[in-house]
Amino acid sequence: MKKILSFCAVLLMACSVNAQAQTNAQQNVSDAKAGQAQLLPWETPRDTTCHEVLLETTLGNIRVALYNDTPHHRDNFLKLVNSGYYNGCIFQRVIKNFMIQGGDYSCRKVNLGKVEKFDVDYTVPAEIIYPKYYHKRGQLCAAREGDDENPTKASASTDFYITWGRNFSPRQMEYYVEKEKREGKSYAIPSAELQQGYIKYGGVPHLDNGYTVFGEVLEGMDVVGKIQNVATNKENNDRPLDDIVITKATQVK
């Protein structure tokens, strides 16, 4: 009888341990999901009145929101979307652990026999709102010519990129800051608050305060992740070996 009772006690203890482990695992998953939704103390909630655009690509869909406090870029992007310009554009430049870039006029794939004319010979005035908008992972940003040709940092009319960047541990962020200090790049050192943002989200801090960030990815970061992982031709300006096409861009809000 004692042996039976001892066995039952061990069995109950094992069941209790397993149940607690499952509870802890479920709690960890819940905490992780909650953490993704939680903002850092200095962050402000996204403006829910923002216009939204759905980019349907050959690797999946990406839904983006356009910031209202970058109105020139918002309106320009919506104009291009609603004119059909982005239908047939490709992501022509992709760099792993950095960003994916699309929208270049010279790389559009149009249907044979279809005549399309778009006026893209213009720039968009810079709307750099830093540090409110910085280059954390998943930001929609405007490409541009370099500072020598473009000291005002005006954006290209059609080219955009979505950030991916790298993940930072606290020690890696410290190392990054130390490196930028040694190289005299004080302009590339994020504030203490932004350092916490890069540790939480990942991103590309050296682009901060140099390019206009005008939106963010709402859905489809898994697709962005797939795109930034594709094989590319580094001798052809990092163009993917197989074209990744934006088959359709639609304003959905």
Model-based region annotation:
Residues 1-23:
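Bacterial Sec-dependent N-terminal signal peptides
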